[in-house]
């Protein structure tokens, strides 16, 4: 029913759940028993419905994730899918942790500010750095000279 309700959005099997705005496709990864995690599918569909495509500042990612989880709760109700709000909050917490970790100065460990598109500056020691994407890999921070 979900797929037929959104004919302009493609759904394809992938190695994880994510929305690809360039392909207009929701990718999903069936579980070992072949079933689909409907909550994650609806969450990624929510990104599609909300036209989420990119973000300029890291804090914007947290904002669009919050929007997507709010939409997930709305859609899940319409499709009679139970969303464990603790798990949804845990997912948002993981983005908050991601944001915090990116803002830690690689020189003095103080919290820096994102001053430009994915460029941080430490208010304590003046170091500037760019973190890698690190949403699904290990975080690295590269000092800017």
Report residues per predicted region.
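Alpha-helical scaffolds flanking conserved acidic
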Residues: 35-40, 86
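Pan-zinc metallopeptidase signature
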Residues: 79-89, 93-145
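Short N-terminal micro-motifs specific to bacterial/archaeal maturation
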Residues: 29-32, 59, 113
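Post-HExxH zinc-binding segment in Zn-dependent metallohydrolases
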Residues: 60-88
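Active-site scaffold of zinc-dependent metalloenzymes
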Residues: 1-37, 48, 52
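N-terminal accessory/interface modules of nucleic-acid-binding and processing proteins
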Residues: 3-13, 50, 58, 75-82, ...
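Catalytic Zn2+-binding segment of zinc metalloproteases
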Residues: 45-62
């Amino acid at each position: 029913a979900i797929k037929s309700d959104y004919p302009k959005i493609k759904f394809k099997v992938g190695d994880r759940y994510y929305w690809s705005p360039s392909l207009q496709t929701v990718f999903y990864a069936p579980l070992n028993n072949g079933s689909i995690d409907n909550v994650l599918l609806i969450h990624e569909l929510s990104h599609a419905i909300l036209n989420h495509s990119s973000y300029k500042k890291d804090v914007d990612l947290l904002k669009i994730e919050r929007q997507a989880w709010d939409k997930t709760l709305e859609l899940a109700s319409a499709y009679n899918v139970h969303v464990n709000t603790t798990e949804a909050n845990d997912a948002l917490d993981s983005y908050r942790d991601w944001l915090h970790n990116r803002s830690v100065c690689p020189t003095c460990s103080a919290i820096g500010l994102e001053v430009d598109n994915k460029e941080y500056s430490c208010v304590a020691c003046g170091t500037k750095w760019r973190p890698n994407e690190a949403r699904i890999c290990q975080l690295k921070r590269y000092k800017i000279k």
